[in-house]
Structure formats: C-alpha cells, structure tokens
Amino acid sequence: MRVVFFLVILISNWLCFSQEISTEFVTKIPLDADTFVGVDDLGNIYYLQNNTLHKKEVDKVYSYTNTLLGKITSVDIKNPLKILVFYRDFNTILFLDNRLNELTNPINFLEESIAKNMNAISLSSNNNLWMYSSDDNTLALWNHQSKKTIFTSQPLQFYKENFKPTSIVSSYKEVCIFNNETALFFNEFGAYINNISLNKTDQLHYNNNQLFGVEENTIYQYQNGLSKKVRLSDKDISIKSFYVNKDHLYIFDGSSIFVFKFLKI
C-alpha cells in the first residue's frame, strides 16, 4: 500500500514538473522605452519611445516617426526586412525596411474601401495581411500588392458566442485572434481550427508556430489545448511585456530587458 502511495506521489510530481518549461538567465539589458516591441534574429532590439519606433543595433540606433498619422498602435517585426507599422486612429499602415526607411506609401483602408474601423493587423506570408475590423466583426486575409481580399471569415460570434477580439498575432502557418478570455485559431488558408480559454491574457506571441502568453505575471506556452508554465530560473520579474524568438525569451519590466534561454521547449 505504501509503495502504491509513493508511486502516485512520484507520478503526480513528475506530471506537474512536465508541465513546466525551464529556462536559464542569460543577461539583463537596460532599456529606456515606453513600449518594448521585440528582438529580431540578429539580436537587434525594437522599441517605442515618444511615439517613435527605434531599432537598436550593437553600435547604432535607427529611428522612424510620422507625426501625420497619430499614435503607433502596433509594430510587427516578424520580417525585419519588411516591418509593419499600424496606426489605428488613422486606419493606416506602412512598411519599413531594415533601416526603418519607408518601403511603401501609407495605405489607408478607408481609401481602399475596406473598412472604416480597422482594429488589429498582423503579417502573413506572400504579401498578405491578417486584419480584424469591428465594422462587421470578421477576420480577413488581404493582399496589399494586388489590393484583393483572399478570405473573409464568418462573423466571429459564429465561432464563439459574443466574441469580440482586441488583437491578432500570427505565424506564417497560423493566426490567433483573441481577447483576454478567449483565443480563436485559423490556419494559413482561413480554415477555423479551434479555440482556447485564457485567463486575463493581454499579450500573445508566436515563435516557430508555438504560442506564448502572459497570465497574471506568469508566461505560458499553449499547445494542443494544453498550457505549460515557463519557469524563469528563480527570477522574480514584473512582466510589462515580452517577446519570444527561437530559443530565447525577452522580458521587459519597464526599465530593463531580461534575457532567458529555453532549456527545452
């Protein structure tokens, strides 16, 4: 009987441990920023300060600002050679190169007769953009070169009752549209996959088709309907924002970036 009890405890502890992802602390980088955007494959840091986008390399900082388009809503650095900047107040996007020079003229969705209220946008592949508009509460895939809509979903309440999202994140294979309670997933062709429940999550990031989010100051990985806690190697950090790139996790606490390496994902 004691042996059985011991085995139950051992298995329970193993299961709990298996639901965690271990990390090791790498370094701490001071950063004076209003918003930490992320880090690209070369270790360059992107951030917002005074409504200006900055890219910090080892020995140089590039900057971009556009006072005519209002406040920057979001920046997508998935492709560092084609950075997407979204200005929600003016219903406008533009693309920047790796030195933060404009690649395109601003694209105004009202002028393109797409939507009056574009709320969230994320990069896809092949010059496509995932877009959410509160006008009709749908998710759309739009090609910014051909100016054609490739896919439009059903109204999102069709997939989840009373669902009204606040943001979008995507990989090149999948898109996640979410609020702080629910996330809906669609594949690259617009087919609905599933949905998961979240716990007060306001930040999600894809990394190699794996989704990470922060809930109550703890980072989790979501995969196959399960969540795994990311253990920050005994560091107690107030998570203002975070970013995941390959095998590294970057956490911004408002004054510094804490860099961790995943021991196993």
Q: For the regions a protein language model found, what residue spans apply to each?
A:
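Bacterial Sec-dependent N-terminal signal peptides
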Residues: 1-25, 265
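Start-of-domain marker
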Residues: 20-82, 88-90
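Surface loop/turn motifs at the tips and blade-to-blade linkers of beta-strand repeat domains
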Residues: 26-32, 63-68, 107-114, 152-161, ...
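Repeated scaffold domains used in trafficking and secretory/extracellular systems
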Residues: 31-40, 69-77, 114-122, 160-169, ...
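Short beta-strand elements that form the blades of beta-propeller/WD-repeat-like
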Residues: 35-48, 81-87, 93, 122-133, ...
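Structural signal for beta-propeller blades
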Residues: 53-54, 92-93, 137-139, 183-184, ...
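Short loop/turn segments that connect beta-strands within beta-propeller blades
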Residues: 56-60, 97-101, 143-146, 187-191, ...
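Surface-exposed, polar helix/loop patches in the mature regions of secreted/periplasmic/lumenal proteins
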Residues: 85-147
